[in-house]
């Protein structure tokens, strides 16, 4: 299943049905009076957060959604049936934005949460509604009210307890594959990870969900590399694990590069609890390791954990620190179910311009 975290869709609720002008016609009853029924109410456009989804790919191929129109009223005081509502299913963590892409309309945070995005139009009154002592035979009825229509943006942010950040090739995917059942693509070149990955981690009996996002490079907030758009998927995390490659030229500069991109992105990412780890310690000699550790300690103003995703050294300590921050709150079932789909190697699918 391809990963798509943003989509633009058009929605329109149903128009209300028209009221009916009709009169009672029976033998020997000369003035039967009005009996035109009311029109039915138009269907709503409803968005529902469901379990088991972790992509908006369905909205890449269909962008127009219209609810059913209410039926017209009929004679003999028969009211029109209401139009059928349409329900759009989205993953938990999806946000609805107005067409300007900035105005937040709703944020889905729980399975089963529903939001009426566009209400159907009310049905028009039939002529029986207008009968009064002074108007015994009204010959007019109301048309149904039109439904609402609008363009919206759906933006999904994965729900995870902890997030992995770092430069490309910092060893994030290797770390995730070692501590969970996730199977991300791993290779010795930058940007191996093209879309976020999720894994369920068990640290001393405490489970939490860990998210790995594509690596950041200098200028990512300006669109360099894969940009910083995937940082939205760690906005909901309670803690960040910042991995720095011990084999890079300068661990301190590598750390500051990522921190600068987090600050430029915003979203309070720099205010989150951060655990710093120097990775790939098995690939450098002791003297170089000490230099890199000291550089990273000065830049981060905290002592980094020394780990190796390949050998497993220091990994348990990092997981315990993450679990201590995450706490004992249970992992959402949505995040667990997303792991299998998130581990696929399908490329990220860019949103396509809506047709029509």
Curated annotation (Swiss-Prot):
InterPro entries: G_OBG, GTP-bd, GTP-bd_Obg/CgtA, GTP1-OBG_CS, GTP1_OBG_dom, GTP1_OBG_dom_sf, OBG_GTPase, P-loop_NTPase. Residues 327-356 are annotated as: Disordered. Mg(2+) binds at residues 173, 193. The keyword Membrane does not apply. SUPFAM superfamilies: Obg GTP-binding protein N-terminal domain, P-loop containing nucleoside triphosphate hydrolases. GO terms for cellular component: cytoplasm. Its EC number is 3.6.5.-. It is found in: Cytoplasm. One of its GO terms (molecular function) is GTPase activity. Signal peptide: none annotated. It holds the Pfam family GTP1_OBG. Residues 160-327 form the OBG-type G domain. The keyword tRNA processing does not apply. Belongs to the TRAFAC class OBG-HflX-like GTPase superfamily. OBG GTPase family. An essential GTPase which binds GTP, GDP and possibly (p)ppGpp with moderate affinity, with high nucleotide exchange rates and a fairly low GTP hydrolysis rate. Plays a role in control of the cell cycle, stress response, ribosome biogenesis and in those bacteria that undergo differentiation, in morphogenesis control. This is GTPase Obg. It comes from Bradyrhizobium sp. (strain ORS 278).
